[in-house]
């Protein structure tokens, strides 16, 4: 069905359509006066490289949401194929207090938790926030990076985790 009437698109139809899209899987983490918290997210996007800026969308009903706002910092940890279980844990399978018990965590510039072995970690300061529907779009200035090479990226598509194998880039 093709429709241009926004009222004709139900929330369930929209969620079903979005489930068909493949997205990288991230653990978004924070720490500071509001406490340590984290969640799994696929709604992360580059905004600009000058200055380096990302956006992440967080549901205002999430138990972790107040900590992100109070702390004003976050780290977007992009997951590898080895982190599927961790992605499920941070998606709500385990309580907030137990989510950081597993792998090694470090810190970069902002103090937000950085997952050791993440494909890449974007250490950010929240510089703007926009309310849209049930979510906030957080605009985040990247203050530091950590990355590894050779790992396979974890994706989420069709309501299942998938792996995107790394390929060698071919020179000209």
Swiss-Prot record:
Catalytic reaction list: FMNH2 + NAD(+) = FMN + NADH + 2 H(+)
InterPro entries xref list: Flavin_Rdtase-like_dom, NADH-dep_flavin_reductase, RutF, Split_barrel_FMN-bd
This enzyme's EC code(s): 1.5.1.42
GO MF entry, a single one: riboflavin reductase (NADPH) activity
Domain of life: Bacteria
Keywords: Flavoprotein, FMN, NAD, Oxidoreductase
Family under the similarity heading: Belongs to the non-flavoprotein flavin reductase family. RutF subfamily.
PANTHER family assigned: FLAVIN REDUCTASE (PTHR30466), FMN REDUCTASE (NADH) RUTF (PTHR30466:SF1)
Protein's name in the database: FMN reductase (NADH) RutF 2
Source organism (scientific name): Methylorubrum extorquens (strain CM4 / NCIMB 13688) (Methylobacterium extorquens)
Phylogenetic classification of the source organism: Bacteria, Pseudomonadati, Pseudomonadota, Alphaproteobacteria, Hyphomicrobiales
Underlying gene: rutF2
